[in-house]
From Swiss-Prot:
One of its GO terms (molecular function) is glutamate N-acetyltransferase activity. Pfam families: ArgJ. It is an enzyme of class 2 (transferase). Substrate binds at T156, K182, T193, E279, N403, T408. The keyword Amino-acid biosynthesis applies. It comes from Methylococcus capsulatus (strain ATCC 33009 / NCIMB 11132 / Bath). This is Arginine biosynthesis bifunctional protein ArgJ. The gene is argJ. It is found in: Cytoplasm. Belongs to the ArgJ family.
Amino acid sequence: MAASPEDRNLSDIRLCPIAGIRLGTAAAAIKHVGRDDVLLIEMAEGSACAAVFTQNAFCAAPVTVAREHLRQAPRWLLVNSGNANAGTGTRGLADARASCEAVAALVGGRADRVMPFSTGVIGEYLPLDKIRAALPKAFEALSEDGWEAAARAIMTTDTRPKKAVRRIEIAGRPVVVSGIAKGAGMIHPNMATMLAFVATDARIGAGLLQSVLERAVNRSFNCITVDGDTSTNDACVLMASQRSEAPLIEPGSAHVEAFQSAVDAVLAELAEAIVRDGEGATKFIRILVEEAASEDEARLVGKTIAHSPLVKTAFFASDPNWGRILAAVGRAGCKDLDISRVAIWLDEVRIVAAGARDREYTEARGITVMRRPEITVRVSLGRGQASARVMTCDLSLDYVRINAEYRT
């Protein structure tokens, strides 16, 4: 996808090491030879860990195991790319647990303190022997400076690594939040193919950390879509090593909002990076829904527009077929929507006013906007004060090619 003036080169972002968090990678040749595809993350003893997972009923075996192990104060994360270990039944569960046992044997810990994550092709058994063989190298590579290699090791159809970092001060003491993510297709997270791993040195309890993560995910990863498909393997993990000299962040304290804002910003940047790297994407689309009755309603309207194949192909063709956007708003399910109060813009051009084509709108003005690499669709429902933002991309011929050829 072509870069815009606002599109920073995310590959150039340098992530800050997090004291107490070490990462190591290795090549297991799961799908590609000579490329790191196994990631091991170690959290110092006493770290807190929060996570959210896919809501897909056919969740992958590692998701089931990771959910169980999250309750055991996990210390290690094991991630592999190239194989999703989804749709693999009881053997898949056994393989996921065996991979945790392999890590435990290597580090001298407990298997139920290892959380497994996988991403890649669905329906194929995990190459457990390859992963076992790669683990010693990943363990030897563990380093607080391992973020760059980690960001690349978790990639599948991604064209570039996704990284984000924020530095804040709490009571005059520095706190860092660093994160990586992967995802380019099968992207319609509902945490509920997308993985994100974020770490901080903040001092914060696991319960509050979970609340912060859930709020941040709902405003970021749950507001993006590339193709409307929710992966079997989606997961987002937030780790806190407790190593900062800043005071403990406690519920109700003035420090919670500052920390929440930092996590929000990191996840929002990672979410945007995923959309910008959408499979075959040529355009980045923001959808802003305003004057809705509730934030949920605004998000629903935004997602309905973003999911529409007709809307997405119109963006790819630079075709200002605004009727497709209007139809998406109408079928979003807003109860008792007064269409005479609805207005729609493409960037600065108003295309719909009072529920009908704007009198000053021309096809030429619409085409001018639709040819841009970044476009904002703004919808005013005229029925409240709530708003939401959803991010998506166009649907191109390359998207069809990439996914048609994914296994061939």
